[in-house]
């Protein structure tokens, strides 16, 4: 198997930065060695957000965004390589998820579109890149998401303890690691996405640090009930969603029924939406003894406190306490998925995505052999 050092790259639905992780990976271990977060320029972030909310653009504009984002990913990887004094031949491959701008896994022509030209990353770094992870699963009848539960199973499953892993990025997703049962998982709904969108529009802040603003407000129960009446929350698994659905336009449509609300009350209610929609799915799935939380939302003390309050009898903690950085989990997962692709191993879990069969995922963008001798 192609063991060695891999790099994972993930920007996520929150667009709060490009996470880059270096790890040593083989069939027995995933050992994180270094990481960094690379900033996304505001203009690029806003252009991506506009696409995700359905704003029309020309093919030329889409092509330019694809190249610019790929170049940014390449710069982020180079920064990590320079930080760790690494050369191209030291890295087997880079696993790059890309930036999802549209995810529509149902209908006549199911699809998922990520941008961030992987050729740009290869050209800048001299390292082979593995990308386009989702579309094979969709071609096999799956949702193409979530893909991270397979990684959660490999690292965090316990032989006796009922565990669930909760990733709170822009979207929140659950992985159910129940002994003796196939792994299941799906997107529960918005994680940080709506909270971040609201504070960005209201206060031009990227996120609500330590939930300081939300703590100034109060939960508006009728508004929360309106949020939760969206059909996505009651839809059966397998299911997945993204910014093309839960975006600022969605929030505006709900708020139109409640004119004059204080902005901080809306923020407090969005925190409660995230916590309630997650906890309901945990309970509907039979509950767990330990809920291991990762992603940006694990750093939100109000979200964590509400989850603990809504899930009595469950130990709500972070993956950091299990030895895996919650901030780097998704980037690490795509480094691991790149390893599986290079090794010719299946990367999806049909019990999670609904695909007809397990499959090797992704496309390989090989580096020039003179650069990449791994």
UniProtKB/Swiss-Prot annotation:
It comes from Enterobacter sp. (strain 638). Catalyzes the specific phosphorylation of 1,6-anhydro-N-acetylmuramic acid (anhMurNAc) with the simultaneous cleavage of the 1,6-anhydro ring, generating MurNAc-6-P. Is required for the utilization of anhMurNAc either imported from the medium or derived from its own cell wall murein, and thus plays a role in cell wall recycling. GO terms for biological process: 1,6-anhydro-N-acetyl-beta-muramic acid catabolic process; amino sugar metabolic process; peptidoglycan turnover. SUPFAM superfamilies: Actin-like ATPase domain. It catalyses: 1,6-anhydro-N-acetyl-beta-muramate + ATP + H2O = N-acetyl-D-muramate 6-phosphate + ADP + H(+). ATP binds at residues 12-19. Signal peptide: none annotated. HAMAP family: AnhMurNAc_kinase. It holds the Pfam family AnmK. Belongs to the anhydro-N-acetylmuramic acid kinase family. The gene is anmK. One of its GO terms (molecular function) is phosphotransferase activity, alcohol group as acceptor. Its EC number is 2.7.1.170. It comes from the Bacteria. InterPro entries: Anhydro_N_Ac-Mur_kinase (IPR005338), ATPase_NBD (IPR043129). This is Anhydro-N-acetylmuramic acid kinase. Pathway: Amino-sugar metabolism; 1,6-anhydro-N-acetylmuramate degradation; Cell wall biogenesis; peptidoglycan recycling. Keywords: ATP-binding, Carbohydrate metabolism, Kinase, Nucleotide-binding, Transferase.
């Amino acid at each position: 198997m192609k063991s060695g050092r891999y790099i994972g790259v993930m920007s996520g639905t929150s667009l709060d930065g490009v996470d880059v992780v270096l790890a040593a990976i083989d069939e027995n271990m995933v050992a994180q060695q270094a990481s960094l977060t690379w900033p996304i320029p505001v203009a690029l972030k806003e252009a991506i957000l506009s696409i995700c909310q359905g704003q029309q653009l020309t093919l030329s504009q889409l092509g330019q965004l694809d190249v610019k984002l790929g170049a940014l990913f390449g710069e982020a990887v180079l920064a990590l390589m320079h930080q760790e004094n690494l050369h191209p031949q030291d890295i087997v491959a880079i696993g790059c998820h890309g930036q999802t701008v549209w995810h529509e896994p149902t209908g006549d022509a199911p699809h998922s579109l990520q941008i961030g030209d992987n050729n740009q990353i290869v050209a800048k770094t001299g390292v082979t890149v593995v990308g386009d992870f989702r579309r094979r699963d969709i071609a096999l009848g799956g949702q193409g998401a979530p893909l991270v539960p397979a990684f959660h199973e490999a690292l965090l499953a316990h032989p006796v303890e009922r565990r669930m892993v909760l990733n709170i990025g822009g979207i929140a997703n659950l992985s159910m690691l129940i002994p003796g049962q196939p792994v299941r998982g799906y997107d529960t709904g918005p994680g940080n996405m709506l909270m971040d969108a609201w504070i960005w529009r209201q206060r031009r802040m990227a996120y609500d640090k330590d939930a300081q603003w939300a703590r100034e407000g109060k939960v508006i129960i009728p508004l929360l009930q309106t949020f939760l009446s969206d059909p996505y929350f009651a839809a059966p698994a397998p299911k997945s969603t993204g910014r093309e659905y839960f975006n600022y336009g969605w929030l505006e449509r709900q708020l139109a029924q409640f004119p004059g609300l204080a902005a901080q009350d809306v923020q407090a209610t969005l925190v409660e939406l995230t916590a309630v929609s997650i906890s309901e799915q945990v309970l509907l799935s039979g509950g767990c003894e330990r809920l291991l939380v990762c992603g940006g939302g694990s750093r939100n003390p109000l979200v964590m406190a509400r989850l603990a309050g809504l899930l009595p009898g469950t130990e709500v903690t972070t993956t950091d306490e299990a030895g895996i950085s919650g901030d780097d989990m998704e980037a690490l997962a795509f480094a691991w998925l790149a390893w599986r692709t290079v090794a010719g191993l299946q990367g999806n879990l049909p019990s999670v995505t609904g695909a007809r069969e397990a499959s090797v995922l992704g496309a390989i963008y090989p580096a020039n052999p003179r650069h990449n001798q791994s």
